[in-house]
Amino acid sequence: LYPTLLVKGAPLAANPGDWVPYDTEIAANVVADLKEMVPPWVRIQRIQRDIPKHQIIAGVMNSNLRQYARRELKRRGKRCACINCREVWRARIDPADAELRTRSYEASGGTEHFVSFEAGRKLLAYMRLRDDEQATVRELKVTGQAARLGAEGSGVQHHGLGAQLMGIAEEMSNDFGRLRVTHGVGTLEYYRKLGYELDGSYVVKGL
């Protein structure tokens, strides 16, 4: 979410017309309004552009606009449901308390399934499964600190939530006969251990 900033050299600086920039208070209220509306399968990655203050002519000068928006939400008695605000990170949560949730919605000619393990409002792990002509896992993530492949430990990433989500994806995609996964180079070995094979830009498993 990037409120407009007027920077040096921009065409708007020479001809602003009726444009009036947001100040920090107004911008925080607008961002808080948007955060109230965001569904739980959306991630708000960034709020406010990271532009050096000396280059800004007009607009929000505070780089911590997200904190201002959170303060405004707290004042309203509301919370943001976006992924970024619900991830576990360093919170102490027992994965055994996780509840499986599935939220489905139509998008771009197909059906998206956001399948997650949650404890209260905290998000422990999630997967995005898309059904159109094929079944595709577009994203799989276990929140918290990253776990090295094969390592042992007690954190969220060591409880097999990712593998459980992949098993659920396979069950949901059974009618398609196969499941493909968008993957990164560093996760190829992980998917191979789950029975997937490299096929072009995806890893694929017959069902």
What role is predicted for each listed range?
Residues 1-22, 41-67, 142-152:
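Flexible glycine/acidic-rich beta-alpha junction loops that bind and position SAM and/or redox cofactors
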Residues 17-35:
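Phosphate/diphosphate-binding loops
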Residues 44, 137, 184:
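Conserved, mostly hydrophobic/aromatic
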Residues 97-98, 103-145:
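A conserved beta-strand-loop-helix scaffold within acyl/acetyltransferase catalytic domains
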Residues 153-172:
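Conserved acetyl-CoA-binding loop-helix of GNAT-fold acetyltransferases
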Residues 171-183:
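Conserved GNAT acetyl-CoA-binding A-motif
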Residues 180-189, 207:
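Conserved beta-strand-loop-alpha-helix junction that forms the acyl-donor binding cleft
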Residues 185-202:
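Conserved active-site alpha-helix within GNAT-family acetyltransferase domains
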